[in-house]
Amino acid sequence: MAAPTMKERQACWGARDEYWKCLDENTEDASKCKKLRSSFESSCPQQWIKYFDKRRDYLKFKEKFEAGDFQPSKMTAKS
């Protein structure tokens, strides 16, 4: 598989950004962003989609942690 061209990368990043914006505006309700998710999936290589999904999860976790909203699980609290 050839590496994506600059135009393909920009289309992927744009689709990702639109999807993430939709999630932010709809309090993470993915059902309201299905069309944008489809566009994201059709614009990006599968490996990139996995990476971006994990990256978003990490960034949201980090945001909560830094804001002091993180609550450790009961298993973690016992350790």
From Swiss-Prot:
UniProt KW DNA damage keyword: no
Residues in CHCH domain copies: 9-52
Compartments (UniProt record): Mitochondrion intermembrane space
Matches recorded under SUPFAM superfamilies: Cytochrome c oxidase subunit h (SSF47694)
Intrachain S-S bonds: C12-C44, C22-C33
UniProt KW keywords: Disulfide bond, Mitochondrion
A Pfam entry, by short name: COX6B
Domain of life (superkingdom): Eukaryota
One biological process term in Gene Ontology: mitochondrial ATP synthesis coupled electron transport
Gene3D superfamilies reported in the protein's UniProt record: Cytochrome c oxidase, subunit VIb
Motif Cx9C motif location, chain numbering: 12-22
Any one cellular-component term (Gene Ontology): mitochondrion
Function, in words: Involved in the maturation of the mitochondrial respiratory chain complex IV subunit MT-CO2/COX2. Thereby, may regulate early steps of complex IV assembly. Mitochondrial respiratory chain complex IV or cytochrome c oxidase is the component of the respiratory chain that catalyzes the transfer of electrons from intermembrane space cytochrome c to molecular oxygen in the matrix and as a consequence contributes to the proton gradient involved in mitochondrial ATP synthesis. May also be required for efficient formation of respiratory supercomplexes comprised of complexes III and IV.
Family to which this protein belongs: Belongs to the cytochrome c oxidase subunit 6B family.
Protein known as: Cytochrome c oxidase assembly factor 6 homolog
Native species: Bos taurus
Lineage of the organism: Eukaryota, Metazoa, Chordata, Craniata, Vertebrata
